[in-house]
Amino acid sequence: MKIIIVGIGKVGYAIAEQMTGENHDLVVIDRNSAVLDHVDSMLDVMCVEGNGASASALLEAGVREADLLIAVSENDEVNLICCLMAKKLGAKHTVARVRNPEYFRDAPILRREIGLDMIINPENAAAQEISRILRVPSAFSVETFASGLVELIGFQTEEGDSLVGKSLIDYNRENPNSILMCAAKRGEEVIVPNGSFVPQTGDRVYVIGTPAETTRVLRSMGRAMAPIRRVSILGGSRIAQYLAWVLTDVGTHVTIVEKDEAKCLTLAEKLPKVTVIHGDGTNHDLLESEGIFHCDAFIAVTDRDEENLLMALTAKRYGVKKVVPKMSRMGYLDIVNLTGLDTVISPKAIIASQISSYVRGLANSQGSAVESLHYILGGAIEAVEFTATSATHFLDRPLSDLHFRNGLLVAAIVHNGRMEIPNGHSQIHAGDRVIVVAKKLFLQDLNDILG
């Protein structure tokens, strides 16, 4: 596919990196020549210097032949104008980054009037992911599929866990049809496990099942499942605002610490149920006097990765049971892993996976639709949700009759609203949702899983 990206900041670069990795024909537009020089040296892309909302820059980028234009500059208005111009000039599909909550609430109108095909909001996406993790505090990652019927959770195994020290065949024999372990990381090795895999203490693993089953399994291993009732947020960013809306709606007490007084006043006006504290979030005297660490979860979402990491570690030292820092620089992830923090949020990585899911769906509009896509274990594994259609080649056949590609699992099937952990007798029918977990095979169609 020919894809144009307007705006090469953190989000734009992450999307460009993902799209070039999936072998798309990519053009990037930005006003900053230094940024373009860097992108040109790192990625296989064509660069156009200019205003992405101008017809001249869009035409130079080949907008008339573009299958998709993605506008992700720092300015919402520029992104919207860019998509409007691109559609008028012939782009088949357009995606705009919209961060302002007021615009984001008007998404249906924008789609209809401007012809937008998709609106992305990294801050809202990050807030939604944090809220899912807080619902299962003993997990470091929680992803959902099939409108919430299926849950993929990541956690670190501990000594004494029922999963540890026995093969998955033996575990599944003792716990039939409950969950499926579908990915693991041991040291630097990433594994899509088969039945002979034996989990060890300290493995980072992912299991899939219904929300009720994944919760039951974690509880049976003694994991803390008490609800999160008090949350402290460092930084009055848009992520903080979106997250506060979600949490206060379910009765969670939220405190936000922000050092910019004007921003505090705005937050206090928009979030009447939230306690907003004006002050430096790195000032320990302030944090102690205000009881910021007397909470069930501490979320650090300032604009500085270093501050987020430092204060997350401080919160952990104070005994906060769930700590989540936001990281923009993926290079920091190795450092984070060494600190013992198990959960990190990266808005740009979340958006890159959303865009990848959308692009794969466009590229295969006649086949089995890609409904959602999540990258796990640092992007080494992808979990893809498909809808089986009449174009699927192996409908109504037992899975034991099929030969699948290496490094791949059919992890779950949803039929008529019921989730099944598949076995050799299971069959896929038209209309079923199928979740596939694989090492990065860039699956675009359900038929791609066959060897």
Q: What spans do the regions from the language model cover?
A:
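Cytosolic regulatory regions of ion transport systems
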Residues: 1-451
